[in-house]
Amino acid sequence: MAAYLQWRRFVFFEKELVKEPLGNDGAAPGAAPVSGSAASKFLCLPPGITVCDSGRGSLVFGDMEGQIWFLPRSLQLTGFQAYKLRVTHLYQLKQHNILASVGEDEEGINPLVKIWNLEKRDGGNPLCTRIFPAIPGTEPTVVSCLTVHENLNFMAIGFTDGSVTLNKGDITRDRHSKTQILHKGNYPVTGLAFRQAGKTTHLFVVTTENVQSYIVSGKDYPRVELDTHGCGLRCSALSDPSQDLQFIVAGDECVYLYQPDERGPCFAFEGHKLIVHWFRGYLVIVSRDRKVSPKSEFTSRDSQNSDKQILNIYDLCNKFIAYSAGFEDIVDVLAEWGSLYVLTRDGRVHALQEKDTQTKLEMLFKKNLFEMAINLAKSQHLDSDGLAQIFMQYGDHLYSKGNHDGAVQQYIRTIGKLEPSYVIRKFLDAQRIHNLTAYLQTLHRQSLANADHTTLLLNCYTKLKDSSKLEEFIKTKSESEVHFDVETAIKVLRQAGYYSHALYLAENHAHHEWYLKIQLEDIKNYQEALRYIGKLPFEQAESNMKRYGKTLMHHIPEQTTQLLKGLCTDYRPSLEGRGDREALSCRASSEEFIPIFANNPRELKAFLEHMSEVQPDSPQGIYDTLLELRLQNWAHEKDPQAKEKLHAEAISLLKSGRFCDVFDKALVLCQMHDFQDGVLYLYEQGKLFQQIMHYHMQHEQYRQVIAVCERHGEQEPSLWEQALSYFARKEEDCKEYVAAVLRHIENKSLMPPLLVVQTLAHNSTATLSIIRDYLVQKLQKQSQQIAQDELRVRRYREETTRIRQEIQELKASPKIFQKTKCSICNSALELPSVHFLCGHSFHQHCFESYSESDADCPTCLPENRKVMDMIRAQEQKRDLHDQFQHQLKCSNDSFSVIADYFGRGVFNKLTLLTDPPTARLTPSLEAGLQRDLLMHSRRGT
């Protein structure tokens, strides 16, 4: 009783009498019940109604005259005669338009069960598909209750003698249905209800003294005794899924809830219960104040007609009374069209319409019953936005009352719906920092925090100096559990001086740049920073060494150089405790790390030498820098032995073949550092023999000048001419070197004698004795050449005379052909045959097979063709000479004409293999052309 009295009472339903429509035409079928002032009068039901039910859009009534009445939503009452005497029980199925009824057609105790198909008509009335006696045996007994399963396969009938019959099969047909006695007892059956759970069907049976359940979907119908007290008629009901389909039994002391196999909770609702219903999550109980034995329900119903009755609507989930009102002589309570309808003995129908959720919530808000409002909203399945609004109002209420701890808990429940800044502004006061911390923690746990929220939360931790909470916040087990922006957290912790926490975040979440910044800029732990870089993957190790390499080189040069060597050769991360190290090694470009070694030449030299040895295919910049470094060391070295060693190293590097493509750069480096041996070596490699010669000339190294000429004179003969000119200008006694040069010039015929004499004439110390031997040898050679030319001329003349005689003989004398063999096949000559004046004879078929022309001898044709080609070439040159002379005379710019002919290769020497008599024509033509060219050029100048 105490618990019941503590339940709050509300008016969540509106009551009004149902009124008749304006007229027969005033309401269309399916229209809402008319209950306003426009109605003419209140609706009045027929008298003598004994039983009621509802479903399929209608209220169904049975009366003492045997009629069944239907009241649809249009409030147009219709009925038909179902029994001859009276109707005692009705059950309207909710999923099928089937009505089951129990009544009497004759006097005595002989109740009949009728099944009506309301969708089919028989003479204007619903079709009765089945009629059978309710009593299974011969002993008369009164039906006390009736229930039907929605699948139409089960129907149970309870009797006052304590028995229960079960109809199994299609209840609408006799031949498909089987009736058997399920239960026998000593107490009247007051309530029945089917409960479906999966494929299992239970039947609850309640009497005045006990509660039981049966499994009717299987064999043997196992029974479970649930309780040893029962209830009166119409004081039991089955709840909806919101209460897990529990069977409700309302006794005078308590209301009990049952599962098929056990008893559930109970509620201390005192008072004599008359009617129990379940409506949309509410328990509806009609009771009266004075206590009457439940057994009197079977003996003296009329004695109750004048009693005052109270209807209470209970919300069992939220533990409040949603409505309570008194009525006179309630016949029954029905639920249809989303409302409750209370039928009273005077024929009136009272409608109880539930208020909308928002109205109910506002009523609770006015009384500051926020917890109850929250529970109500959840039971009414209010959406998350609506719930968040309630949480916010509840939080505001608690905050205004000074209950900040409670307020923040409500604000936490709004996360995801309410803008966080609304809550944060309320708790920014330093005294409420722990509440703000709790809110921000939850915001992060739900992954709804931004960078500003993370910053604020970490600042709260640091102000509270709560290291344990801080560590708990940042030390998550996995990446998926991180509910904050890691980079923001690192920044805040670093700024607050929590370096170890910032390092933990940076290392565990792979923020390598932040980790190195803190180690190098804040903690100055260079060794640890270098170790950390050494265990990173290749790409990240490379980028971080480029970024922080100079700093590390400045403080720990040797260790940094060692890491760079590995990074550029065969890098493998030094990951502790990890067995699956990278299978493929990576290699960085060593040239890109050279700037890191600024102001560290010793480490740079070690790095470059290591790369050149271990990785011969290193970038060219490595070798260029190494050469420059060695030349600098050589130039600044004072110790002779060390300088000699550096000299050898520099020369060795130059001879390594790495500077072929960057010859100019290496040459500039050697010249900048005055490394003469390197300069000369590069000159020689670049075939710059003139520069080598000039170098020795500048340093008056006579023997080296001669050596250069001897070594490279074959490739560049002009070196001897330059050497002769050089020695000729020397006022010193250079006879030995001049003689050596002249010997080579004379042997190779490199210069005309006249030019040699003119060159030596510039030397005032040179005498005729220097070139006497040269001139004598030259004159002797020319004399020999003249003798050979004269001999050749005589031979050409004799040959010419002989040929002329042959030509004359051919013209004047007959030619006798005496050849007996073919000149081609060398077989005996047979007719027909072909003869030529040259003396060759051929078979006709051989001649036709081998000759290119009928007028030419196949044997003489190759030699004749050479002569003809030479003649044509001479004719072309003669024509070209005439054309050249004409253009030269007509042009204002003679030099342009000459240059054009030179460019076209006109003056190139034409070489032909000809007979000796014709050879002398070409030199004369060329000599004449060149002589005319020179003369004309002189006149032009």
Swiss-Prot record:
Output the GO biological process annotations, alphabetical, semicolon-separated: autophagy; intracellular protein transport; vesicle-mediated transport
Modified residue annotations for N-acetylalanine: 2
Q: Record's superkingdom? A: Eukaryota
Q: Which UniProt keywords apply?
A: Acetylation, Autophagy, Coiled coil, Cytoplasmic vesicle, Endosome, Lysosome, Membrane, Metal-binding, Methylation, Nucleotide-binding, Phosphoprotein, Protein transport, Repeat, Transport, Zinc, Zinc-finger
**SUPFAM superfamilies, per this entry?**
ARM repeat, RING/U-box, WD40 repeat-like
Q: Which residues carry this modification: Phosphoserine?
A: 813, 924
Topological type in the membrane: Peripheral membrane protein
A GO molecular function assigned to this protein is: nucleotide binding
The CHCR repeat units are at: 411-561, 572-736
User: What does the similarity note say?
Assistant: Belongs to the VPS11 family.
Oligomer and partners: Core component of at least two putative endosomal tethering complexes, the homotypic fusion and vacuole protein sorting (HOPS) complex and the class C core vacuole/endosome tethering (CORVET) complex. Their common core is composed of the class C Vps proteins VPS11, VPS16, VPS18 and VPS33A, which in HOPS further associates with VPS39 and VPS41 and in CORVET with VPS8 and TGFBRAP1. Interacts with RAB5C. Interacts with TGFBRAP1, MON1B, STX7, STX17, ECPAS, EZR, RDX, MSN. Associates with adaptor protein complex 3 (AP-3) and clathrin:AP-3 complexes. Interacts with PLEKHM1.
- Give the protein name, as stated in the record: Vacuolar protein sorting-associated protein 11 homolog
Source species: Mus musculus (Mouse)
